[in-house]
A protein has these predicted regions:
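Short, motif-level signal for alpha-helix interfacial/capping segments enriched in acidic residues
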Residues: 23-25, 126-127, 220
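Generic, ordered loop/turn and secondary-structure boundary motif
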Residues: 43, 54-57, 66, 70, ...
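Conserved catalytic cores of soluble enzyme domains
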Residues: 3, 148-278, 282, 286
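Hydrophobic alpha-helical segments
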Residues: 88-90, 127, 134, 232, ...
Length: 308
């Protein structure tokens, strides 16, 4: 049972008991218990708790941020090779009046939407669509903003047959050489190569309770411990939290969230995001393309220097 399910269970218990006892003296007041449980759960969240917060069904997805932060949005479709991918949102729009290209891994807000966008797991068509729009952005001098929120690339046979690995690898190569600014925003889950394919950037901004790792804790536990139930233990070992990644130099800016998650006050987080994006775009747009690419390459090379 996740932390949010525990809290929901406590709320339902209060409702059911009060429904059966309508007298003022008999009514159950669980407010104190709820607050105590919330405080205990969220005061010092461990890595596994952060994974659960990042996966929370009511956590605002990329579509929320895009609608709140951009204007004149025109969605674009197709990779011009084999098809489209609903899990990859691509568009042009304006950020505070500046034309930008927007790429986002799309998750739904309910089961039907998640089925339509494959729970945020991209196919090769999605990565190729993203690359097509990034090359278009380079041609017209538009900064690129990518929103990462995926458990990983789609691992199905159809994706492998269409060249999933090649599509991801090509994005890594091409993004490292693009002549326009690239800023990546990690909203929830940043899983495996599926996230990396949108993360070769000049600056990375990450929400406080987001996670980013080579694979899921369940996958890590299955491979190394031969036991998927040890996922919580694996999460501690993987150093996947925003705080760990910031300390090791992988993430440039951390954006604070409410203690229980962004879903409690998304408007405040949007305002903070907007300010950070504005400041970073101003600085990056001042750089010549050769300096931009050199700095991006140097940033990537530093990752191998992390001390374990």
């Amino acid at each position: 049972m996740t932390i949010h399910e525990k809290l929901d269970c406590l709320t339902r218990l209060k409702s059911e008991i009060n429904k059966n006892d309508l007298s003022d003296n008999g009514r159950l007041d669980l407010t104190t218990e709820q607050l105590s449980l919330r405080e205990e759960l969220f005061a010092h969240p461990d890595p596994w708790m952060k994974v659960q917060i990042a996966r929370y069904a009511h956590r605002p997805n990329a579509q929320y941020f895009i609608q709140a932060m951009f204007t004149d949005i025109i969605e674009l479709h197709g990779d011009r090779q084999s098809g489209d991918d609903n899990a990859m949102f691509g568009a042009i729009g304006r950020f505070l009046g500046v034309p930008v290209t927007i790429l986002a891994q799309r998750k739904g807000s309910n089961l039907q939407e998640n089925l339509q966008c494959n729970f945020g797991m991209n196919s090769p068509e999605g990565y190729r669509k993203a690359l097509r729009l990034m090359k278009q952005a380079e041609k017209f001098g538009r900064p690129i903003l990518t929103f990462v929120d995926t458990p990983g690339a789609y691992p199905g046979i159809s994706a492998e047959e269409k060249g999933q690995g090649e599509a991801i690898a090509r994005n890594l190569m091409e993004m490292s050489q693009l002549k326009v600014p690239i800023i990546t925003i990690v909203l929830g889950e940043g899983g495996s190569g599926g996230a990396l394919a949108l993360s070769i950037c000049d600056k990375m901004i990450m929400l406080q309770h987001a996670v980013y790792s080579i694979l899921s804790p369940e996958g890590f536990a299955t491979i190394l411990y031969k036991d998927a139930t040890r996922a919580a233990e694996a999460a501690h070992v993987m150093k996947l939290t925003a705080q760990d990644l910031h300390a090791n130099g992988f993430v440039d800016i951390l954006v604070a969230e409410p203690q229980e998650g962004i879903h409690l006050a998304p408007e405040k987080v949007v305002a903070t995001f907007t300010q950070h994006l504005r400041e970073e775009l101003i600085q990056l747009r001042k750089l010549k393309s050769d300096v931009l690419i050199a700095n991006r390459y140097a940033r990537l090379r530093k990752f191998g220097e992390v001390q374990r």
